[in-house]
Amino acid sequence: DDVFLTKKLNADGCHLGQKDMNISDARKIIGNRIIGITCHNSIKLARVALLKKADYLAFGAFNLSETKKVKYKASINTLKKAKKITNKPIVVIGGINSNNYQKLLLNKANFLAISGYVWNNKKLKPVEAIKKLKWK
């Protein structure tokens, strides 16, 4: 969310939410580094992000999440529609775990945002949680 920190750390890129800095201003600061945009459950927001040259799109929440309060509910249909309008990578977020990730991958999600599953998992240590995400 922090373009200035991205530049200071010489990071590969950053992710911008709808209430963060706009992508045009971010590009002026970090140039051609990766910028991803939150699109919630909206193909309209995705189209705007693509016009502004986002490098990837993020949709969610696909499930209930303990990491953030769910304000927008995305669906497999949202993911399918997004894949029809772009070849850019799609990140899926929101309550993703070892019981529900495969359906998202089968529907062509490129990346899984799984911080809550990894770091807040009450049953598994982080490495164990990640290992459980094997393609079955």
Predicted regions and their residues:
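Alpha-helix-loop-beta-strand connector modules within alpha/beta enzyme cores
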Residues: D1, D20-S42, V70-S98, I130-K136
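Generic structural signal for hydrophobic
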Residues: T6, A26, A49, A82, ...
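Glycine/Thr-rich beta-alpha phosphate-binding loop at enzyme active sites
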Residues: K7-L16, I37-T86, N121-A129
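Generic detector of intrinsically disordered, low-complexity, polar/charged segments
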Residues: N10, C14, R33, V91-V92, ...
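Glycine-rich phosphate-binding active-site loops on the catalytic face of alpha/beta enzymes
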Residues: Q18-D25, A58-V70, Y101-W135
